[in-house]
Amino acid sequence: MSPVVAVVSKRRKQLKHLAPIDAQQRLVQLWLHDKPASTRERYTRFATAFTAHLGGVGKTISQTTVEDLVEFSEVLYQRNLKEPTINTYMAAVRSLLSFAYKTGYIQFNPGAAIKLKKLDQRLHEKVLNETDIALMIRLTERTEYRYKALKVRDVLILKLLYVAGMRISELVGLRWKDFTPRDRTGQVTVVGKGNKTRHILLPEYLWVEMMEYRGDAGECDYVFPSRNGKNKPLNRQNVDPIIKDAAERAGLSEKVSCHWLRHSHATHNAERGTPVPLIQQTMGHADLATTTQYIHIRPGDSSAMHLPRV
């Protein structure tokens, strides 16, 4: 028996003798088990919303139909959620149902019949130019803070999100043990989506700044700890205001978020001719096509530019 089959068989046995509601709760726990902490937090919220919807019509996951999924999607629309958010909810529910099917908890997978909507990504609207990013960082450096350490922290958060192209969940989860020296610089080990690990070599100037910021912090200490406790990471909800404040200082839109810096990392590298596989590796994209889209969002030329004036 292969390891995968053994795991599925074990999980099926764990669910078999439980009452319907207990089995449903255990199913969700097993589904969440191997996911990163940030994903577990969001997926728990999505699963709770879905099972509450089913409970409202007297059903459990084992009785789910395609019609239930359509109705749940409509409920999300009625809550005035944006389409990308609804897509995220439905993707999580499909993942849960797929897991339920693989473990034998359900006999057929209604989620397989549901297609997620294709969204207009408009990545070009979420890319800052290099001057804007430099301005965000420089003006933050010149801003008066009550505590100097908080200013240094905010500047390094801006730099890591942009220079290393990190996701916000990856940034807040960093511990000092993830930083490894290499010659005059060093690398940081990042655990991304799907618990996939990647290594990012940092430029020398950023490595030096990170080590100066570290001080006497221990290996297991969070790089950006919560002010409510040293053994807790900075909450991701507390990072967005740092980015928005920096954008406001630079006279940019209030819509600027952490992910804009990641988008900008990919776009600026593509425009500078950085090899696409290297960008993919640094950003942790599972599919090269995800990285390739950044090459085309701000073209330097097009066939339209080569036609005569009409």
Which residues does each predicted region cover?
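Conserved catalytic core of the tyrosine transesterase superfamily
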Residues: M1-V310
